[in-house]
């Protein structure tokens, strides 16, 4: 109530918000006296079609899913993999192989406690712990990699959890088509790459996203994904395998959000993010 009274006060002319949809939408609907710049929830996703750097791709994804225990608004939640699998430099990999290999990559990356604790940080709320436990139970999909609890001797009261990976079919939309904040990701089996791109676009257009990614060695696939993300207005990362990650999307070095899909009504930080906070007031008189 205190916050609501503050942000609707006539003297408040600019409101910046990052958080969940419910209060974010309340701000947009009720702060009529102010400009509201809101970053809300979305379903960030990645399409995997093919790769010529299979292990580097897995390492990159493992870091992405683990960083800050998935508690970044840019972290990928849904990874779309064709039912027939993907092509790699080591030959074809089935959907099940991709699932198992990504699980091994995450586990291997976090196998050293000093690395795991530095990358994961800690879970920030009891609600996130509940979501992790729900995912671990298998209620949302097949458990490919269960979350485990780690102890941090420097912060003995902290709640540290490794990522949980779930497998599901594209038809299981209730499971993966909403933001599940925390280290929870879905490897979604889709009919083919075209279906994956179409699904990615539909999710972003209807539910929003701050980031999208694609892995493919084929120019036509990259062109199709680029076109889809232009229509749905989301930042696209292509074939990231090194020290740059899809969830590292920061204002000033990148554009954080676009303001063009439901995940945010502004881009942090394009010219409008700054200029729209000001107005021009003129005065005239005879000389």
Which residues make up each language-model segment?
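Residue-level signal for inorganic ion chemistry
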Residues: 15, 82, 183
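Structural motif
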Residues: 18, 82-84, 168, 190-191, ...
């Amino acid at each position: 109530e205190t916050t609501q009274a503050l942000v609707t006060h006539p003297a408040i002319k600019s409101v910046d918000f990052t958080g969940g949809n419910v209060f974010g939408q309340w701000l947009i609907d009720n702060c009529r006296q102010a400009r509201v710049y809101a970053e809300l929830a979305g379903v960030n996703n990645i399409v995997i079609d093919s790769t010529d750097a299979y292990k580097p791709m897995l390492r990159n994804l493992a870091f992405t899913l683990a960083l800050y225990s998935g508690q970044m608004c840019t972290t990928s939640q849904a990874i779309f993999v064709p039912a027939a699998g993907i092509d790699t430099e080591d030959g074809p990999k089935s959907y099940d192989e991709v699932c198992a290999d990504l699980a091994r990559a995450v586990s291997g990356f976090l196998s050293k406690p000093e690395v795991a604790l530095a990358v994961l940080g800690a879970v920030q709320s009891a609600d996130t712990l509940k979501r992790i436990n729900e995912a671990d139970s298998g209620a949302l999909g097949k458990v490919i990699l269960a979350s485990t609890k780690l102890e941090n001797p420097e912060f003995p009261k902290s709640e540290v959890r490794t990522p949980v990976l779930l497998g599901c079919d594209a038809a299981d939309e209730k499971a993966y088509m909403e933001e599940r904040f925390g280290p929870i990701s879905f490897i979604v089996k889709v009919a083919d790459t075209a279906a994956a791109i179409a699904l990615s676009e539909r999710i972003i257009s209807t539910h929003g996203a701050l980031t999208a990614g694609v892995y493919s060695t084929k120019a036509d696939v990259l062109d199709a994904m680029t076109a889809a993300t232009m229509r749905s207005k989301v930042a696209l990362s292509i074939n990231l395998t090194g020290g740059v990650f899809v969830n590292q999307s920061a204002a000033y070095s990148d554009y954080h959000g676009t303001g063009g899909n439901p995940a945010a009504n502004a881009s942090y930080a394009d010219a409008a993010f700054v200029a729209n906070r000001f107005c021009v007031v003129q005065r005239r008189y005879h000389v």
